[in-house]
């Protein structure tokens, strides 16, 4: 929403009437998702105990629903394993920007890919761009959203599991109690809930992220378990900061001396009100790099 001469100007999105036949045959210039390669060994994740524990819990939860072995969801709820009536559909990870939510989901997917491969099961992750969904007209936006779920269902088989990663889901699904809610957002909400309710958790799981938990619609929280991404400790932020500093030091300063300067920056930024996060650690290290190594004040 923008302010202009004291007036509220709300973006109006044109509404188009799309028939069911047109919806089924609609083709987009590009899909609103990217299929992430979970087989890659390399990762940009800096391993610290707090996040490692969080990722481990996520992997265990996903494996419980996706596995077909003993003590799995299918074992405990054999009569419901092929049903879409089970109320749990996935997670919403909350936390400040830069708290590692998206990276944690991708890393959990990578580890699950390796673990379930031993059961002959393939795991894939569709990384959904909410911006690509929102850029259409009303009618088109709903169909873009449906295309995500259609893709997930197109590969449903006994040896395939799908993770749907919705980044910043609050930008896609606005709470119906929010005064800024428009007809297009209400329609998107309805489409999302309808599609989610048709998912079988043993085949497809949603992992969403948000920096604004208070903006989530209650219906989202009733379907997706809300989990807080734990903030890194001060020492863990120093570990992350160290990875952004020259290994051999520079300009007469060792890496450890640069790290101490980065630690001071971290504390200064914390005192200014910035929440503890991996982003804060990297930002503080880059500030030191630019000043002490590059020479740009």
Name what the model sees in each region.
Residues 149-156, 185-203:
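Substrate-engagement module of ASCE P-loop NTPases
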Residues 225-244:
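Conserved AAA+ ATPase "SRH/arginine-finger" region at the nucleotide-binding site
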Residues 1-6, 14, 34, 249-297:
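Conserved AAA+ ATPase small/helical "lid" subdomain
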Residues 82-83, 87-126, 151-155:
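Walker A/P-loop
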Residues 130-142, 172-186:
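Flexible beta-alpha connector loops of hexameric P-loop NTPases
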Residues 36-89:
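Pre-Walker A (pre-P-loop) alpha-helix and adjacent loop at the N terminus of AAA/AAA+ ATPase modules
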Residues 212-225:
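Short regulatory helix/loop adjacent to the ATP-binding pocket of P-loop NTPases
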């Amino acid at each position: 929403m923008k302010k202009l001469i004291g007036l509220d100007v709300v973006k109006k999105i044109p509404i188009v009437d799309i028939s069911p036949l047109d919806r089924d045959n609609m083709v987009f210039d590009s899909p609103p998702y990217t299929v992430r390669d979970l087989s890659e060994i390399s990762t940009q994740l800096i391993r610290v105990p707090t996040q490692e524990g969080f990722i481990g819990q996520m992997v265990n939860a996903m494996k419980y629903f996706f596995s077909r072995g003993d003590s799995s969801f299918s074992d405990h709820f054999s009569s419901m394993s092929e049903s879409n009536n089970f109320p749990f559909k996935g997670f919403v990870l909350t936390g400040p920007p830069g708290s590692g939510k998206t990276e944690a989901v991708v890393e959990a997917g990578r580890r699950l890919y390796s673990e379930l491969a031993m059961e002959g099961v393939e795991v894939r992750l569709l990384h959904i761009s909410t911006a690509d969904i929102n850029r259409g007209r009303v009618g088109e936006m709903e169909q873009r959203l449906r295309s995500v779920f259609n893709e997930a269902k197109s590969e449903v088989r006994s040896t395939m599991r799908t993770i749907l990663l919705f980044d910043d889901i609050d930008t896609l699904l606005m709470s119906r109690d929010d005064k800024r809610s428009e007809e297009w957002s209400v329609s998107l909400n309805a489409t999302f809930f309808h599609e989610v309710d048709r998912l079988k958790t043993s085949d497809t799981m949603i992992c969403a992220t948000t920096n604004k938990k208070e903006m989530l619609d209650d219906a989202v929280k009733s379907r997706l378990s809300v989990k807080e991404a734990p903030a890194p400790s001060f020492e863990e932020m120093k570990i992350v900061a160290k990875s952004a500093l020259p290994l051999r030091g520079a300009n007469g300063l060792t890496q450890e001396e640069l790290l101490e300067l980065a630690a001071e920056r971290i504390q200064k930024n914390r005192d200014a009100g910035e929440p503890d996060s991996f982003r804060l650690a990297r930002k503080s290290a880059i500030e030191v790099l630019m000043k002490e190594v590059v020479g740009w004040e």
